[in-house]
């Protein structure tokens, strides 16, 4: 049985917004955070160079949250990327907030998905309309989204579909055709661009990547 932490707080009413707030956030945001649970967390090591990512999978009453911090070298320059992805209970992407800090300063990207339409910092990106999943170029976390959503049987293929791919360090959003084939209980073959890129993926009980062939390796995990 999980432990429940009871929080008592004084609610202040903001004079500027008129919205009740607790510790600087709205009541709705406070309630969501108070009832969230970290399902899994871990560390991935980048195998193509210098890089680490700390990751958390969080469950709330209504959403799944994928949250990570990436430290790496981009063009021999230190870079830090942070992201937070909100998905519904069926792992369909709802929104994402991404920030990147490097020698060029800090940049931010806000993505929203609404009924098959994708918005990039408030502007519709028609090139990725119809996509269901977001795909982060610097992280193996988002491979979990189609794996969870599709629930493939062993030997079954997803067929080709388009993901909304976030390129790093450009922080641009573009379509990426891809396909998943379930090879075994915890193993998948991932391919993109019609087979131009192929890699084997090994997952854990939560369908999080433990080994992304040649690119990422999970070095620890907690549940």
Task: Give the location of each predicted region.
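Hydrophobic/aromatic-rich structural module bridging two neighboring secondary-structure elements via a short loop
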Residues: 75-121
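Short loop/turn motifs at secondary-structure junctions and domain boundaries
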Residues: 75-78, 191-195
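Short N-terminal edge-element motif at the start of the domain
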Residues: 41-86
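Solvent-exposed helix/loop surface patches that form functional interfaces
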Residues: 28-54, 108-189, 193-194
